[in-house]
């Protein structure tokens, strides 16, 4: 799924105004591993499906970029991306 961003960002040395979320490459095993990493980093915090921090971690994996790149997006772009992940996780 390609998402058009409002701003441009330097991601992996390239200037981008889109992000590609490849949910098809995400397996259940990988999703559980991302969840474990999230809980470890956040001292066991419960993962709510609408948790933006968890959604950002999933988005970074699906896009093949660093989580910090997602976290550096503008509020609007961050919300757009994490909302798409949340919709996917709820489907």
Region annotations inferred by a language model:
Residues 1-91:
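Short, surface-exposed, charged amphipathic helix/loop patches that serve as local interaction elements
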């Amino acid at each position: 799924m390609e998402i058009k961003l409002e701003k441009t960002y330097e991601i992996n040395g390239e200037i981008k105004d889109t992000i590609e979320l490849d949910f098809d490459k995400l397996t259940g095993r990988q999703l559980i591993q991302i969840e474990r990493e999230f809980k470890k980093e956040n001292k066991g915090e419960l993962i709510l499906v609408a948790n933006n921090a968890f959604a950002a971690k999933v988005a970074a994996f699906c896009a093949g970029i660093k989580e910090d790149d997602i976290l550096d997006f503008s509020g609007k772009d961050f919300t757009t991306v994490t909302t798409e992940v949340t919709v996917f996780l709820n489907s």
